[in-house]
């Protein structure tokens, strides 16, 4: 099983590449790698990024977004990694701007996926907050690849386009016994300041 850290976004709202912002003395991407490594669940951690940032990452293989699908958001990153590593039975996808992710949350989601993958033939298992799925903290089956490819060929690069056309299910973030906001995206500098307090 492989983990994909999505780190190719433009970070326009944040004002600088979020992957290299720091929390507790570690860059966001390093923080996520530390959590993923600690779990001994993943045989490889892959960073999906763009050509400009690719050489800046250390500690994991970097796959640059497929040239024909550059600048098409998270789907482009997932597609580019899946296309190269199609033999993996499952991919855990995490956005780099979610540096508070915990091993407990990932383990709970994995158990949910395993319990439902055969009976319900799940392709995507992820978290949701209320009625809002969080497709950038989710497990993806390689079965999603053709659907992602079709989405990238269309004019709709939204994650919703994919999870509405696959067998997907979501567990609420509140089901994880953790009082931190481990699932929160850091979109603005003030978001980072608020979690440092």
UniProtKB/Swiss-Prot annotation:
It catalyses: Mo-molybdopterin + GTP + H(+) = Mo-molybdopterin guanine dinucleotide + diphosphate. Mg(2+) binds at residue 97. Pfam families: NTP_transf_3 (PF12804). Keywords: Cytoplasm, GTP-binding, Magnesium, Metal-binding, Molybdenum cofactor biosynthesis, Nucleotide-binding, Transferase. GO terms for molecular function: GTP binding; metal ion binding; molybdenum cofactor guanylyltransferase activity. GTP binds at residues 6-8, 18, 65, 97. One of its GO terms (cellular component) is cytoplasm. The keyword Iron does not apply. CDD domains: MobA. Its EC number is 2.7.7.77. Its main location: cytoplasm. Disulfide bonds: none annotated. GO terms for biological process: Mo-molybdopterin cofactor biosynthetic process. It comes from the Bacteria. The keyword GTP-binding applies. Its cofactor is Mg(2+). It is found in: Cytoplasm. Gene3D superfamilies: Spore Coat Polysaccharide Biosynthesis Protein SpsA, Chain A. Signal peptide: none annotated. Transfers a GMP moiety from GTP to Mo-molybdopterin (Mo-MPT) cofactor (Moco or molybdenum cofactor) to form Mo-molybdopterin guanine dinucleotide (Mo-MGD) cofactor. The N-terminal domain determines nucleotide recognition and specific binding, while the C-terminal domain determines the specific binding to the target protein. Belongs to the MobA family. This is Probable molybdenum cofactor guanylyltransferase.
């Amino acid at each position: 099983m492989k983990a994909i850290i999505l780190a190719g976004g433009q970070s326009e709202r944040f004002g600088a590449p979020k992957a290299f912002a720091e929390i507790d003395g570690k860059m966001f991407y390093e923080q996520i790698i530390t959590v993923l490594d600690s779990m001994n669940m993943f045989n490889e951690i892959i960073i999906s990024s763009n050509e400009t940032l690719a050489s800046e990452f250390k500690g994991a293989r970097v796959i640059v977004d497929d040239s024909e699908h550059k600048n098409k958001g998270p789907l482009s990153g997932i597609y580019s990694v899946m296309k190269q590593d199609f033999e993996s039975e499952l991919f855990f996808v995490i956005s780099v701007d979610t540096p508070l992710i915990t091993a407990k949350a990932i383990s709970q989601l994995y158990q949910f996926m395993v319990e439902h993958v055969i009976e319900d033939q799940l392709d995507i298992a992820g978290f949701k907050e209320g009625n809002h799925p969080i497709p950038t903290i989710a497990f993806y089956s390689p079965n999603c690849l053709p659907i992602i490819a079709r989405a990238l060929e269309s004019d709709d690069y939204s994650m919703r386009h994919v999870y509405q056309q696959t067998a997907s299910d979501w567990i609420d973030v509140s089901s994880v016994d953790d009082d931190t906001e481990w699932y929160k995206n850091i979109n603005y500098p003030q978001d980072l300041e608020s979690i440092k307090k």
